[in-house]
Design a protein with these regions (language model features):
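Sec-dependent signal peptide cleavage junction
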Residues: 19-32
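Early extracytoplasmic/lumenal segment of secretory-pathway proteins
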Residues: 32-119
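A structural signal for short loop-to-beta-strand junctions that line the ligand-binding cleft
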Residues: 41-45, 105-111, 127-166, 191
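Ligand-binding "clamshell"
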Residues: 121-128, 148-154, 234, 265-276, ...
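Short beta-strand->loop
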Residues: 127-138, 156, 270-282, 291-294
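Ligand-binding pocket segment of bilobal, Venus flytrap-like solute-binding proteins
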Residues: 193-197, 201, 205, 213-277
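Mature extracytoplasmic/periplasmic domains
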Residues: 291-352
Length: 397
């Protein structure tokens, strides 16, 4: 995931939006700087003399950090609280999990997606949150709370949400793609990018053969792996953040990615467009959590509460392009973003969307092993033909 890079005109429009959307400062609010005010009913200074440094580990540049003339919400937090922030990034949920599992490092706040929250909670890797220290939790929309990956939100506070979809270059496709299966079309050999993480890649391939994004057996994992092998010769590269340079630079015809990042890419290259494939997409919630070995639990809860402040949430949502779960922030958004079918799709998309569930250990193990096998597979077959045979085999079984 990557921050949003605005043109000069877009930055000017954003400035107007921020000024016009900002609420009138309440009598008890604290003005941190000209861009950010926070609630005065919270003791932001209680750790000011404790010389605390919070280690924050987030998806790749998934925050408004002062880059490209954005509002720096991290430095504003330091100014407000006296707490220092050591901010580092990772490129996928799997990288986050591996880093924490390896030991030897201690983070105070992390940002896993839904299924990874469930996995980490199950393995005792997360600390229960004290919501008394996170009063802004009350501003999160009910749609994003009490989900199956964290019933009662014992371990997580929603940060952003979004969907997956297919971004494509309108000058490089004969017809606009409408299905995930279009990524298996041999006409686009060496012009298709694919996720370089197993969970997203398996989810897409599953939909092309009529299966759920949440596989129910090792046999289903094997069928999905076969579909990915069928695509292998068509794929130019398996990517994560590399997708930005490739799609913005016109180096590939299509790629699956996250809707919020698609907004970034389209802003950089007007030849790009985005579609939610008709088979159904992933609806995801990225959350803020505290690892079980965090050194500064209460200060971490303060940071989470701060990110839920409306002005801070607005700065983040506007800059990175992802969808906010904070009701007050959505109400403050510019209409172009608030009513964007990419960022805030309607019922026709969400009704068919699936949330990633925490998979059983045997299915996770099979996925990891077969993903590694697939990546080293050299004969990908003939795309659609192999996919059609897979569909027939599943229908017969």
């Amino acid at each position: 995931m990557k921050l949003k890079k605005f043109s000069a005109a877009a930055l000017a429009a954003l400035t107007v939006t921020m000024m016009s959307a900002a609420p009138v400062l309440a009598a008890d609010d604290i003005e941190v700087n000209e861009d950010i005010s926070v609630s005065g009913d919270y003791d932001w200074k209680r750790f000011a003399n404790d010389h605390i440094t919070l280690n924050v580990y987030n998806n790749g540049l998934y925050i408004s950090d002062g880059s490209d003339e954005s509002i720096n919400v991290l430095s504003a937090f330091e100014e407000l609280t006296g707490i220092k922030v050591n901010y580092t990034t990772y490129d996928s949920n799997e990288s986050l999990y591996a880093k924490l599992k390896s030991g030897g490092v201690s983070y105070d706040v992390i940002f896993p997606s839904d299924y990874m929250v469930g996995k980490m909670a199950k393995e005792g890797m997360l600390s229960e949150l004290n919501m008394d220290n996170i009063p802004n939790f009350a501003g999160i929309g009910e749609t994003y709370l009490d989900r199956s990956f964290d019933p009662g939100n014992k371990y997580s506070v929603p940060y952003m949400w979004g969907t997956t979809g297919l971004i494509y270059n309108t000058t490089m496709v004969e017809e606009p793609p409408t299905k995930w299966a279009d990524m298996w079309d041999v006409a686009y050999t060496n012009n298709v990018l694919m996720f370089n993480n197993s969970r997203d890649a398996y989810a897409i391939a599953a939909k092309t053969i009529g299966l759920s994004m949440n596989p129910q057996s090792v046999d289903e994992i094997t069928a999905i792996t076969d579909a990915l092998k069928a695509q292998k010769n068509i794929v130019q590269a398996y990517v994560m953040d590399e997708v930005f340079d490739k799609m913005e630079g016109g180096e590939a015809a299509m790629a699956p990615y996250y809707a919020g990042d698609a907004i970034t890419m389209i802003d950089e290259n007007p030849d790009l467009a985005f579609v939610h494939p008709e088979e159904g997409v992933n609806f995801f919630i990225d959350s803020m959590c505290i690892p079980a070995n965090a050194k500064h639990q209460e200060a971490a809860e303060m940071f989470i509460n701060y990110l839920c402040e409306p002005d801070v949430g607005l700065a983040n949502a506007d800059f990175i392009g992802y969808s906010t779960p904070i009701t007050a922030v959505w109400e403050m958004l510019d209409d172009d973003l608030k009513y964007s079918e990419i960022a805030y799709p309607g019922a026709e998309v969400l009704d068919k969307a699936e949330v990633f569930e925490t998979l059983p250990d045997d299915i996770n193990a099979a996925m990891d092993a077969q993903w590694s096998e697939m990546k080293s597979y050299e004969d990908g077959g003939s795309g659609w033909m192999v996919l059609a045979l897979l569909l027939l085999a599943i229908a017969i079984s």
